Amino acid sequence: MRPPASPAMVAMILSDTRILEAIERGSIVVRPFRPECLGSNSYDVHLGPYLAVYSDGALDARRDNPIQEFRIPKEGFVLVPGQLYLGVTAEYTETHEHVPFLEGKSSVGRLGIDIHSTAGKGDVGFCNYWTLEMSVKLPVRIYAGMPIGQLIYFEVSGKVAHPYDRKASAKYRTVSPHPTSSKMFKNFGAARRRR
C-alpha cells in the first residue's frame, strides 16, 4: 500500500474562482481578459497575428539563429509538416504567485497541431506573451485569433526567492507581442551571431 502524499508533494491546480481571485489581487494578469475564456480550471489563450520561421535549414545552438517573421493573412495560413513555426499568444500574461503551464486545447490537438516542443511551463514572475513552438502532423490552415491553448495555474510550495522577472540571467524578459527565437546561445557566453 502506497503512503499518502505529503502536502508538499500535492500539486494544486487553481479553479476558476481561484483564478479570478488571483486576477483581482493582481497576482495573475491576463490582457485582454475575457470572462468567456475562463474555464473550470484554466484560461483559454488565442493565436496572435504573427508567425516566424528560422532562416537557415540547420540551426546552431551556440548562435543567435535569425528568423523571418510574417503576419498571418485574413484567409489564414497553412502550416506544413517538417517545419517549425514560432507563434505567439494574443494575450499578455503575468504570474506572480503561481506556476503557469500552457497546454494545447484538445480541439487543436485533434487537428494535429502541437503548440510547444518542450516549453509548456512558465516560471513564477514570467511577464510576457507566450512564444509557441508549433508543428503539425498534417497540413492545416490556421487563423490569427483562433483559440490555441489554455493556461493552467499551479500553487507553489514555499517562498520564491528569485522570481523570473527579477533574475538578471532571465533570457526572455523583454516584452514583445512577436515570436521570440531561441536564446540558447546566451548559455554559451557572449552572443555569437551568424555572419
Question: Locations of the language-model features?
Answer:
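DUTPase catalytic domain/fold
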Residues: R2, S6-R195
